[in-house]
Amino acid sequence: MSPLNVGIVGTGIFARDRHLPSYQEFPDKFKVIAAFNRHKAKALDFAKVADIPENKVYDNLDEILNDPHVDYIDALLPAQFNADIVEKAVKAGKPVILEKPIAANLDQAKEIVKIAESTPLPVGVAENWLYLPCIKIAKEQIEKIGPVVAFTHNSTGPFVTQNKYLTTTWRQKPEHIGGFLSDGGVHQLALVISLLGEFGSVSALTRQVRERSGADDIVFATVQLKNKEVIGSFTYGSAFGATEKSVFLKVYGKNGTVTVDLSDKKDPVVKVKLGGSAEDNGDEQIFKVDNDESFGVNAEFLNFHEAVSKKDKSLYLGTPRTAFHHLACVDAFLKSSAKNGDYVKIEQP
């Protein structure tokens, strides 16, 4: 089978530094053949790196969408433009994969879910954390400690003043709800929800620590899952002063605990302690997780390739409905904080 021809819409930092290398790693499956940026000079710069001929560089969105040689669209746009690109891509008969967050707000996200579920074309959200190898290992171990009772999630770290993504205007003045809370927080939510299930309601307090974040950049929340049998805490923010980077999810069951530790991206581990009491307390088991340098990006593209090539959208894991729930959790955090921590139910698409 010939590789799928990819049209890149939005040729910024992540397109160049992460999407393109992933595509180039699998030349038998993908070929980036076209690029769009409303500033054509930026598209031309990307084209040089991607080896795209100049006649396939566009500053008119309709032209790349209607290019008969493009098999699908990879859209890396500010979130407020995602609903528009989905509508236009589907109308042009093109599958489309979007960068997260799914949209700038829940109304736009609902529209994307509606369009995606009314077409046979694959429409996906590129949530790479859904594909982390640690998830499979952790799921197997969580089955051993059940029933699950509670969890603690923590993703905290120091503010990185040289963060290259802070230079982008759409992040400095975000139109998407929560700014960095939705831009980065949806990753953490993808991990927790993949392992434990959807959130039902939250009580949260959010704050803006750094002016450069453009919006609230930390959240401390308590959570009740949709099944109401599991409660937990969710903490996220990398806007603090000097501190260690700490990313972990600890799951408490009646018969033990499972901890997913991603603090060191290059050396993730899953830790397990089995036993039903202090007296019945087994030795800790540590499961090393294979290092994935792409941190799930390669796997998400291979999954989307499968869905497009087989013309079966059900094969793709990162559905708009799934991504909607992640954004809806951020929306609930913000609404709860505005009500001084009152419990808020997670909105449905």
Swiss-Prot record:
GO terms for biological process: NADPH regeneration. Present with 9600 molecules/cell in log phase SD medium. Keywords: Phosphoprotein. GO terms for molecular function: nucleotide binding; oxidoreductase activity; oxidoreductase activity, acting on NAD(P)H. This is Uncharacterized protein YMR315W. InterPro entries: Gfo/Idh/MocA-like_OxRdtase_C, Gfo/Idh/MocA-like_OxRdtase_N, NAD(P)-bd_dom_sf. The modification Phosphoserine is found at S2. Gene3D superfamilies: Dihydrodipicolinate Reductase, domain 2 (3.30.360.10), NAD(P)-binding Rossmann-like Domain (3.40.50.720). GO terms for cellular component: cytoplasm; nucleus. Pfam families: GFO_IDH_MocA, GFO_IDH_MocA_C.
